[in-house]
A protein has these predicted regions:
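Extended amphipathic secondary-structure runs
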Residues: 43-50, 186-191
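Conserved SAM-binding loop
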Residues: 46-130
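S-adenosyl-L-methionine-dependent methyltransferase catalytic module, highlighting the catalytic core
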Residues: 108-191
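Short, solvent-exposed secondary-structure boundary motifs
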Residues: 41-43, 136
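N-terminal membrane-anchoring alpha-helices
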Residues: 2-41
């Protein structure tokens, strides 16, 4: 037996652990890409959205609104309170709210306001199969109890994400309006 043969099982264990880490990371990134990018882009292509609330960096075709301007978005509207939008009842035929309700303290109040200004409201939320998003304690304040990303004219059930609220009370809430790769890297503290 050579002196290096004792290290072979350890090397195999290390390599297997590294391979598992790479596989899990790839699966988390893929789920996050499908949840945040692919489904959102498919939804955006369906029609021009009269009101794209909390638009981030996307153009929905109508008014694009957010609490902060993330880039050069056409027809941008700055909103200061997502529970008191500056529009009349039923002002928009089609409202899109993508990956926002999980960030707010009171999703019911925001959804009620979306229903007030929109005749048809589509929301996209992180589904439970997207673990990196659904369980993101740095950004999200609630966990939606759903395996679907898209919900038309209804708010899926959710629970308050208590540990996240504690973390955010200490570190602040981070909201990243970029690609899912950047979002995942920042959430993991790698950027």
């Amino acid at each position: 037996m050579t002196s290096g043969s004792h290290n072979d099982p350890m090397l195999v264990t290390i390599l297997a652990g590294l391979a598992a880490l790479i596989l899990v990371s790839a699966l988390l990134w893929s789920a996050n890409y499908v949840s945040y990018r692919w489904i959102k882009e498919r939804t955006l292509r369906e029609r021009p959205w009269d009101y794209n609330i909390c638009c981030g960096e996307t153009d929905g075709g109508g008014i694009n609104a957010d609490i902060v301007r993330h880039g050069e978005i056409p027809r941008f509207e700055l909103v200061t309170d997502v529970t008191r939008l500056p529009h009349g009842d039923g002002a928009f035929a089609h409202v899109l709210c993508s990956h926002t309700l999980e960030h707010v303290d009171d999703p019911k109040a925001m959804f009620a306001e979306l229903r007030r200004v929109g005749r048809s409201v589509t929301i996209l939320v992180p589904p439970l199969w997207d673990l990196a998003a659904a369980l993101n304690p740095f950004e999200h304040r609630v966990i939606f109890l759903t395996f679907a990303t898209r919900h038309d004219d209804r708010l899926p059930p959710y629970v308050v994400f208590g540990p996240a609220r504690w973390i955010q009370s200490v570190r602040g809430q981070r909201i990243i309006a970029h690609s899912p790769g950047a979002r995942l890297m920042k959430a993991l503290g790698l950027r």
